[in-house]
Amino acid sequence: MKQYKIKVLWLRNNIAIAVDRLIGDSLFPMTYYYFWPRTDAWEQLKIELDSQPGLFAKDKVVILNQVTRIIDYWQENKKSVFPNLSELQSHFPDLICSGCY
């Protein structure tokens, strides 16, 4: 997952998830932010990742599995408006937390 970063916006009633590609020291958006559970963010990310040229199937599986784990973690901890960022980072080292509201 070193080539990809998952970005989240942690909200009380939703979690927004997007995927960026890491090239050198720069991040380039691969997907829009999708809000779970407002929409089926996992399915929307899958559709966008399917349309990405040059994205290997194994990388897509790793990304989507990580998204599943992040959504599960959010569901278990959504009562926490401000998650413990060091704990979040220890569970998901490739995650970028864009904000907590």
Swiss-Prot record:
Where primarily located?
A: plastid
Subcellular location(s): the record lists: Plastid, Chloroplast
Q: Which GO terms describe its biological process?
A: translation
Any one Gene Ontology molecular-function term assigned to this protein's record? structural constituent of ribosome
One Pfam family in the UniProt entry: PSRP-3_Ycf65
Tell whether Heme is among the UniProt keywords.
no
The lineage's top-level taxon is Eukaryota
Output the Gene3D superfamilies linked to this UniProt entry.
3.30.390.140
* A GO CC term assigned to this protein in UniProt: ribonucleoprotein complex
Keywords of this entry: Chloroplast, Plastid, Ribonucleoprotein, Ribosomal protein
Give TM regions. Answer: none
Per UniProt, subunit arrangement is:
Part of the 30S ribosomal subunit.
Q: Which family does it belong to?
A: Belongs to the chloroplast-specific ribosomal protein cS23 family.
Question: In UniProt terms, what function does this protein have?
Answer: Probably a ribosomal protein or a ribosome-associated protein.
Full protein name: Small ribosomal subunit protein cS23
